[in-house]
Amino acid sequence: MKIIANRMQVNVGQEAEYKRRHDEIWPELSQLLKEHGIHEYRIFLDEETCALFAILMVENPDRLIDLPSNPIMQKWWAYMKDIMPSNSDFSPVSTELKEVFYLP
């Protein structure tokens, strides 16, 4: 099992909408993520800066390689692009975070 952490951003004033959309996550997207070996996925919001911190546990990171080309994933990204910085393929602008501490 590998833990992956990322930093993203939600546009100022769109925090509640971001949460609402995730509270209503599409069942097909949830299923897709699980099928790709994701067991836990949490996103935290820093309300002062609108920074998002995502943490996910995945069986094997190699299983995530084809996720960006999946039509469900692409549709979700297109749905989210109006409330967060996005790349040209509509994926969220994201920076992988380096683990610097772990308490077993």
Segments the model singles out, each with a brief description of its role:
Residues 11-14, 61:
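A short, flexible beta-alpha/helix-coil linker loop
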Residues 16-18, 53, 64-66:
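Short acidic, gly/pro-rich beta-turn/loop elements at beta-sheet edges
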Residues 10-12, 27-31, 85-97, 102-104:
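Charge-dense, helix-prone N-terminal extensions
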Residues 1-3, 49:
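A general secondary-structure signal for short beta-strands and their flanking turns/coil
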Residues 4-9:
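Active-site-flanking beta-strand signature of metal-NTP-handling nucleotidyl enzymes
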Residues 36-39, 57-95:
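An amphipathic, aromatic/His-enriched active-site/gating alpha helix that lines ligand/cofactor pockets
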Residues 14-39:
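Short amphipathic alpha-helical segments
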